[in-house]
């Protein structure tokens, strides 16, 4: 079952978050310059100051809700995803996977160009129907009750694509943690996931024979 979903964070929760940020005991962090021991304190204070005084969550909430959002249950987890139907007669389906620490917000500026390239100077025949899920434990998806790794997440997302969304054939793209999940989609579920594109090389073939030049480079 697929249910429509609207992002609507209660004002009381936003007030609570801002209150915690304002009351943070900055004296508990040593006054050390640079980033050798973690995030620079001065930078972090500037970031938190922006968060409290300038950041407008409702503006970003509205942006997310400008797309069609849904939730569906796979293996007991309610998975949130954005779906944008592609233009044209037969757009391929593209699964976009974010990383850590990340979210579907990473894709908000590329969903429309991918789904409707003709509106951005491209060819309508290159359109994709875009599926952008929040990974389990991220964003608006449920968190698993016990630890799961990228291979299991790939299994869950493949089930979502073929059983819940009726996509027997799809493509996948991912970066960071999403790249590792993409690798497992291509490795374990190639019957349905026909191709992957990754921008982070997290899995490699076993090392083969190397020549003299390659050995010198190492």
Annotated model-derived regions:
Residues 1-26:
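Mature N-terminal segment immediately following signal peptide/propeptide cleavage
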């Amino acid at each position: 079952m697929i249910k429509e979903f609207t992002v609507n964070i209660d004002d009381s929760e936003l007030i609570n978050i801002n209150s915690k940020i304002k009351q943070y005991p900055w004296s508990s962090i040593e006054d050390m310059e640079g980033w050798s021991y973690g995030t620079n304190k001065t930078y972090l204070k500037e970031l938190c100051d922006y968060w409290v005084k300038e950041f407008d969550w409702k503006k970003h909430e509205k942006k997310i809700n400008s797309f069609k959002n849904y939730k569906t249950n796979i293996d007991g987890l309610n998975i949130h995803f954005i779906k944008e139907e592609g233009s044209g007669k037969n757009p391929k389906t593209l699964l976009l996977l974010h990383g850590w620490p990340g979210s579907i917000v990473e894709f908000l500026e590329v969903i429309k160009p991918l789904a409707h390239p003709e509106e951005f100077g491209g060819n309508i025949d290159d359109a994709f129907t875009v599926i952008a899920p929040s990974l389990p434990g991220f964003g608006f998806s449920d968190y698993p009750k016990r630890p799961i790794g990228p291979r299991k997440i790939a299994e869950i997302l493949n089930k979502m694509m073929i059983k819940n969304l009726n996509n027997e054939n799809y493509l996948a793209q991912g970066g960071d943690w999403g790249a590792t999940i993409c690798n497992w989609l291509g490795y374990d579920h190639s019957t349905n996931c026909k191709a992957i594109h990754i921008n982070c090389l997290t899995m490699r073939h076993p090392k083969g024979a190397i020549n003299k030049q390659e050995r010198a480079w190492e």
